[in-house]
Amino acid sequence: MIKKIISFAICAFIFCLAACENEPPSIRNPIYNIVSYEDGSYLGNKGGIFLSVHFILYDENGREDIGDISLINTDYGYCWNLKNEDLEITKWGDEVYYGYSFFEYDNAESVLLGNYIIRVCDKVGNIVDSGFLVEVENYSKSIYKFDFPEYEISVKDNRKEIEIKKMKYLSCEVKFPRNLAYFKNSRKKFENEERIILSDKGLEPNTLISFRINAEPDGKLIYFLKNFRVQNEIK
């Protein structure tokens, strides 16, 4: 009996020692975007609105030590759960961010605003929380509904230039999904009131263009327009 007690005590001591040596992960600088996708845009035929959340995550034992991740709206008590392998990795500046771009609520018809917590649990049970506020400028309701703004796209100057009409925006980012040579398969940003000149020779008819619209000064509100074919010119 005494031997069993001693063995149990030793095992408990070893477990506690291991747990003490495993420092909890840390979360900092959570950032979010509210992203709306028009039917026929980046997501294909399905439109909708999603909350995108990314953050700097550090664990001294590496990413493999991270267990479950939760995003919690504390005002509504609504929770999304992710596994380690669900995390996206994005580099902004000199920092590496982890997160997820498609937190969905109400069948992608709306986004919950208000107070949020990111909760990360490592594999020995350490838990860390980080809070942040999701809001839309000049919008007072607690639920932000999907409502895609009206706009028109026209082609100018023999298919060299694109113009987006009616929609107000801070900047526009352009990508050619099926022409990888353009902009090295990345998006080129055009600031508000800057002419969107895409080619000095004129784009080929039927060229497909993807538009990302940054609508707010803080970049929190983003729209992906329906992919546009150059042949669909509006006079």
Give names to the regions the model predicted:
Residues I127-E135, G219-K235:
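Edge beta-strands of extracellular beta-sandwich domains
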Residues D86-Y105, K188-S199:
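Aromatic sugar-binding surface patches on proteins
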Residues C16-A19:
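C-terminal motif of bacterial Sec signal peptides marking the signal peptidase cleavage site
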